[in-house]
């Protein structure tokens, strides 16, 4: 899930009209903005080609994504701690407006009781406040970064909060189907 927000074009500055950015995606080393425009808006954009624009980020969405992204890494790490197993990285970790998930190949040693225990430990860990870092590792290649919190580290190039207190209360659910273990996390509305 990419960022959302608005673009304000030079001719629009006085009238405060905005063009919605529905999402952003990286493709071929470019950041592409997918816009909410009609034919009139498209004609206006063509006239403004090459002009500088002002981008307004939907910060509430971005901050939620940073919180949930950090939480899905932490639940993985704490599940390893609770189960005593090294857990393969998720095959997917999709984020959306409401939640974040880790999708694993079937993990038969994780059940609702284990997830409940891990979620309790996760909430205790987060509320006690721990620094979260993202560290560039240039010897691994361009743009290679590692997420770090406490003794844990995971390869990740995404955005994260700086402290676990910012995440807030976490709620979890477990679904097992079609040889997949899916752990979904939701956050309370309040952080820190």
What are these regions (language model features)?
Residues 1-192:
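Active-/binding-site microenvironments in catalytic and ligand-binding cores
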């Amino acid at each position: 899930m990419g960022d959302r927000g608005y673009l304000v074009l030079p001719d629009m500055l006085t009238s405060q009209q905005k063009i919605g950015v529905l999402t952003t995606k990286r493709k071929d080393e470019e950041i592409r903005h997918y816009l909410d425009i009609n034919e009139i808006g498209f004609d206006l954009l063509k006239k403004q080609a090459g002009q500088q624009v002002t981008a307004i980020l939907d910060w509430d969405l971005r901050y939620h994504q940073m919180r949930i992204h950090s939480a899905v890494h932490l639940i993985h790490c704490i599940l390893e701690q609770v189960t005593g197993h090294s857990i393969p990285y998720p095959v997917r970790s999709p984020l959306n407006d409401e939640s974040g998930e880790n999708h694993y190949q079937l993990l038969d040693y994780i059940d609702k009781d284990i997830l409940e225990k891990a979620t309790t430990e996760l909430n205790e860990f987060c509320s006690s406040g721990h620094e979260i870092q993202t560290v560039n590792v240039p010897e691994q290649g361009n743009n290679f970064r590692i997420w770090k919190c406490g003794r844990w580290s995971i390869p990740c190039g995404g955005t994260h909060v700086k402290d676990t207190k910012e995440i807030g209360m976490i709620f979890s659910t477990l679904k097992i189907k079609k040889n997949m273990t899916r752990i979904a996390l939701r956050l309370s509305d309040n952080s820190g």
